[in-house]
């Protein structure tokens, strides 16, 4: 299954706010109207929608998300918590959380077009897993810095999660530590996602 490239508002109307996909928000009451039209949701549909929320927010294909679930299952600790940590520490998501890109798809473009350095080297893989003490910077070119400046100027200036530090005038971000679960950038019940996949495999 490919990455979603369709109308974004249609998705947030059904699934709720997906800040990684778009900074638009569903109108108040639209979710309630959808629920009343569709009646009571089955447990399967509830798990499916939670999985879709995760997939669309982080901009993943079905195959990519399944791969992350399998990695999380093999790791120590809660599978759901590990899954969220893996997704939050992706380079495209870190750029988004720093405000250096307005959405995760925009961050992915920055990385694919070689505008981003990690520890002084160009990284063109959006799924690159960032680690504590990584230094993320814009390439020292006017175009790269201009693209990031647009995002920094238009970002909502929300409180940065405590695992990140931003130096906006240097176009630089620091990864201080692995993300704490309370700073995850999406309202999600990750256990429902794990349950969805445990019933599929």
UniProtKB/Swiss-Prot annotation:
GO cellular component terms given for this protein: chloroplast; small ribosomal subunit
Residue segments, region Disordered: 17-44
CDD domains, per database record: S4
Alphabetically ordered keywords of this record: Chloroplast, Plastid, Ribonucleoprotein, Ribosomal protein, RNA-binding, rRNA-binding
Pfam name, any one: S4
Any one GO biological process: translation
A molecular-function term among this protein's GO annotations: structural constituent of ribosome
Span of domain S4 RNA-binding: 89-149
HAMAP family found in the cross-reference section: Ribosomal_uS4_B
Assembly description: Part of the 30S ribosomal subunit. Contacts protein S5. The interaction surface between S4 and S5 is involved in control of translational fidelity.
PANTHER family: 30S 40S RIBOSOMAL PROTEIN, SMALL RIBOSOMAL SUBUNIT PROTEIN US4M
Described purpose of this protein according to its UniProt entry: One of the primary rRNA binding proteins, it binds directly to 16S rRNA where it nucleates assembly of the body of the 30S subunit. With S5 and S12 plays an important role in translational accuracy.
Name of the featured protein: Small ribosomal subunit protein uS4c
Annotated source species: Nicotiana sylvestris
Lineage summary: Eukaryota, Viridiplantae, Streptophyta, Embryophyta, Tracheophyta
């Amino acid at each position: 299954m490919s990455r979603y490239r369709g109308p974004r508002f249609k998705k947030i109307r059904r699934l709720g706010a997906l800040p990684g996909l778009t900074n638009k928000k569903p109108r108040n009451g639209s979710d309630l109207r959808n629920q009343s039209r569709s009646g009571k949701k089955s447990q399967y549909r509830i798990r499916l929608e939670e999985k879709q929320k995760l997939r669309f927010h982080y901009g993943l294909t079905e195959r990519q998300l399944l791969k992350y679930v399998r990695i999380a299952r093999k790791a120590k600790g809660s599978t759901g918590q590990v899954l969220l940590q893996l997704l939050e520490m992706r380079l495209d998501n870190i750029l988004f959380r720093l405000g250096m890109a307005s959405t995760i798809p925009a961050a992915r473009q920055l990385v694919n077009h070689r505008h981003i350095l990690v520890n002084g080297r160009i990284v063109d893989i959006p799924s690159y897993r960032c680690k504590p003490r990584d230094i993320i910077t814009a390439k020292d070119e006017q175009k790269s810095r201009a693209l990031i400046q647009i995002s920094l100027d238009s970002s909502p200036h929300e409180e940065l999660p405590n695992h990140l530090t931003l130096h906006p005038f240097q176009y630089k971000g620091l990864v201080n530590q692995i993300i704490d679960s309370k700073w995850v950038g999406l309202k999600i019940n990750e256990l429902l996602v794990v349950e969805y996949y445990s019933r599929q495999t």
